[in-house]
Amino acid sequence: MSLLATPMPQAATASSSSSASAAASASGIPITANNNLPFEKDKIWYFSNDQLANSPSRRCGIKGDDELQYRQMTAYLIQEMGQRLQVSQLCINTAIVYMHRFYAFHSFTHFHRNSMASASLFLAAKVEEQPRKLEHVIRAANKCLPPTTEQNYAELAQELVFNENVLLQTLGFDVAIDHPHTHVVRTCQLVKACKDLAQTSYFLASNSLHLTSMCLQYRPTVVACFCIYLACKWSRWEIPQSTEGKHWFYYVDKTVSLDLLKQLTDEFIAIYEKSPARLKSKLNSIKAIAQGASNRTANSKDKPKEDWKITEMMKGYHSNITTPPELLNGNDSRDRDRDRERERERERDPSSLLPPPAMVPQQRRQDGGHQRSSSVSGVPGSSSSSSSSSHKMPNYPGGMPPDAHTDHKSKQPGYNNRMPSSHQRSSSSGLGSSGSGSQRSSSSSSSSSQQPGRPSMPVDYHKSSRGMPPVGVGMPPHGSHKMTSGSKPQQPQQQPVPHPSASNSSASGMSSKDKSQSNKMYPNAPPPYSNSAPQNPLMSRGGYPGASNGSQPPPPAGYGGHRSKSGSTVHGMPPFEQQLPYSQSQSYGHMQQQPVPQSQQQQMPPEASQHSLQSKNSLFSPEWPDIKKEPMSQSQPQPFNGLLPPPAPPGHDYKLNSHPRDKESPKKERLTPTKKDKHRPVMPPVGSGNSSSGSGSSKPMLPPHKKQIPHGGDLLTNPGESGSLKRPNEISGSQYGLNKLDEIDNSNMPREKLRKLDTTTGLPTYPNYEEKHTPLNMSNGIETTPDLVRSLLKESLCPSNASLLKPDALTMPGLKPPAELLEPMPAPATIKKEQGITPMTSLASGPAPMDLEVPTKQAGEIKEESSSKSEKKKKKDKHKHKEKDKSKDKTEKEERKKHKKDKQKDRSGSGGSKDSSLPNEPLKMVIKNPNGSLQAGASAPIKLKISKNKVEPNNYSAAAGLPGAIGYGLPPTTATTTSASIGAAAPVLPPYGAGGGGYSSSGGSSSGGSSKKKHSDRDRDKESKKNKSQDYAKYNGAGGGIFNPLGGAGAAPNMSGGMGAPMSTAVPPSMLLAPTGAVPPSAAGLAPPPMPVYNKK
């Protein structure tokens, strides 16, 4: 189409092009009179007043005031469309400049402003690296404009492409735009301006684009000086001269003088006086903000009028700025007023020109509250995009469906009112997560939402928005579009949900996708998901803000709305990924939110993947395994907040769950999953629950919650647990990781789904996978089709699994490791009650994912309870499941062997980052040491339960085939990761790695060797454990350890080594050091059996 359209601009617009050339010649495009031109090439874009007075529109009979009004209406249409498309404010500003420059050479009578608004935004989105689909741009325009003529989509698309070509030619392909906002922020920092002054200056910079044609007359630095100068006048703030006796603006632009600033101020005030009432109210509100809190309070009267305006400006420019809840409530009257104004404008407008509906719709939507939010999202700050996506996504979720949008709008008022502050906060916070800069932005946004009366726009908010956020934001919105269509159904549900989480989820939905994309861009960016999770106390992942990961809640608390941000950072999950899942989990229902805390890392990523799947499954799926590896290493260090969550992200990378076997093994009945399932859930869940953050192996950093197993109601309480159930596979560490990685890859399902799929899929929850969220439709055999995902999500939301959450659930056969493993490892059941221990215990008692009910009991209490309870439960579980496990193990062993061999090969190639190449069967390590014990230095012995399948030749063959690469090579790799994150533990890991390698090839012998190393390394391990009880995530390296426990004292060290040093790090020194004999049978129940297990091999 572009080819067809390209010639047309010349032919079809012969008159327009001639007029353009005439305008150029008439206006003397190169204007020498202007002193503000930094470079000759820029002269063409700056015009004198005389030249502007003789513009093409004027020559066509349009009055000066009318032309200015058209420019203003077009700018607001672009603003609204940009917010709907969830592009950054930077992108919107660029589109507005394109529009101003275009109409300096063309008449409004030749090119309708609504058409050029779409073309400008379409082009600016590409230029600012936030491309939007033609279809989405057209839909956004149709939503923002009143229904005029029902044009064919093909016609609209061709017209847009044609107009884009005309625009590009008019601009001479000079598409790089410098904005005054950058200079405003920089100058405010230079003069150390107060927050109000900085915010007002920033607003004025946006207003100069929306209300005036200053961008055609003065360079950005001059406009920035004017904005600060006027803000100083309004706020009665005086910027003193420098020590050199020069005015502050001299340091911004040497050509600026006080006279010029006064002239610009007069011009701006004159335009302000002429502007419609709605614009005046907006400026009044800005002025009030500048004048201080007292004025702000008084300004509340104006807020209804300015409501959409300031919020719009703020949304447009600051994602942080969310409409205050009170503003959201008074939308109806304002909407009516705006409708009347729009009618008047239509009457005034020439019949040829469409009314400026763009502005009105904007007002309305903003009034709706969602629109405001979305406009915020439009803000350059990534955070804004998130917030807008939360509000806006629902509006524009598919972005496309007008119905959805309308519905959302209608629901928005009540919806926003219910949880306006938390929702806004979460949305802004989500945005903040998009980038580090965004975080600042989101914190400001959270503060703004907290202080509805006054939009908080920290000076840095622009930076954040302009820096990372645009890309992340822009990208996310785009992703959102794709994903929104998939998640649309969910979003509507979210809207109705009174929970802030619902609102958050919608924000997340949009935001999550953005983040997932952004995450790719910023793999190391702080995880946004946590941001969304903690932001709303309700939303905080398990429904308990503080409980979610222990680590997560505290950071959020500091931020208020941003809490989740810090939490996410702690988790180390990719911000996008995390946010994504989070929002989706919200969509699923608050139930998922409950699990969210634990799944924040796990579930969110899965959700992110789900979103991705919905939007584009293939986008992430191929990369999942690699991504997992990378993110794990990256996130492991990141997560170490002293909280278990940090290691969890690495676990995600491992995606132990993703092994095909897990998929194969029915995980739906989590309680009675196959031995595989039992093993996987047991180890990983525990580790994931409390130790997930502690151990990299434990993949997700699930807050200690009730069992994750119940996908339904209880998930909320112990989302971490559900994560841990799946984690058992992951925790089993590397072996699981290998097997489950495939499965997870196959089913990158949100954690909620995973929980249900847990039975079915096993570790889908871990798919999240820090850096890249592969779509849920991983190719490993788990179906990730949107329908399947939806059904899974629904199931996960169901409280039917609540019973599973109960501690007894841990004892369920499905969760338990094979009988052989159970004998050595009676602890699994105990883990349940060792909630405090759960971080370690959950890893140790891999078989008892249910037991992962990881309450927030203190480590000491948990240790005691866990030791006694875990032993009892383990014994019971062993007897109950021995027979089942044995039969299951036999069949699964063969499958696992195959998968393990393949995976081990891949992993060995991958550099051992995935020690999980060991047997698919989750090595169940029952580590009785609670977090406290880890911290204390491994007071408790480590219990590793290794299913026979794992010990079997399958594992060995895989390990043996790759012993050097996996056993030894991986341990070092893991050790490296561990060393970075764990510190003292790192030294221990390499030896363990060696031991692990040995164990994989020759379980018993290597156990002995590793046991020696254990003793030598115990001190190291103790120190590392003390320092980082959260390193459990590294239990991924526990694969070897598991065998060793079976094999003997060396088991613990081997675990860490075989599983990839992380295990060793995670395992308390005592656990690692304890020889098989040393490991109390009660604690491990593994010491005596380990050797037999190897023999079974």
Swiss-Prot record:
For this record, an example GO cellular component is:
polytene chromosome
Looking at the record's lineage, which domain of life comes first?
Answer: Eukaryota
Where does the record place it?
A: Nucleus
Q: Where is the composition biased (Basic and acidic residues)?
A: 332-350, 652-675, 860-870, 884-895, 1016-1031
Q: Which GO terms describe its molecular function?
A: cyclin-dependent protein serine/threonine kinase activator activity; cyclin-dependent protein serine/threonine kinase regulator activity
Entries under SUPFAM superfamilies matching the protein: Cyclin-like
- One family name in Pfam for this protein: CycT2-like_C
Positions of the UniProt region annotated as Disordered: 319-782, 804-936, 985-1097
Tagged with keyword Nucleus:
yes
Keyword list (alphabetical) reads:
Cyclin, Nucleus, Phosphoprotein, Transcription, Transcription regulation
Q: Which Gene3D superfamilies match?
A: Cyclin-like (1.10.472.10)
UniProt modified residues of type Phosphoserine: 916
Q: Where is the composition biased (Pro residues)?
A: 1087-1097
Point to the regions of Gly residues compositional bias.
993-1007, 1037-1050
Record's signal peptide: none
Q: How does it assemble?
A: Component of the super elongation complex (SEC), at least composed of Ell, Cdk9, cyclin-T (CycT), lilli and ear. Associates with CDK9 to form P-TEFb.
Q: Per its UniProt record, what PANTHER family does this chain match?
A: CYCLIN
Q: Which family does it belong to?
A: Belongs to the cyclin family. Cyclin C subfamily.
What is the stated purpose of this protein? Regulatory subunit of the cyclin-dependent kinase pair (CDK9/cyclin T) complex, also called positive transcription elongation factor B (P-TEFb), which is proposed to facilitate the transition from abortive to production elongation by phosphorylating the CTD (carboxy-terminal domain) of the large subunit of RNA polymerase II (RNAP II).
Name of the molecule in the record = Cyclin-T
Q: Which organism is it from?
A: Drosophila melanogaster (Fruit fly)
The encoding gene: CycT
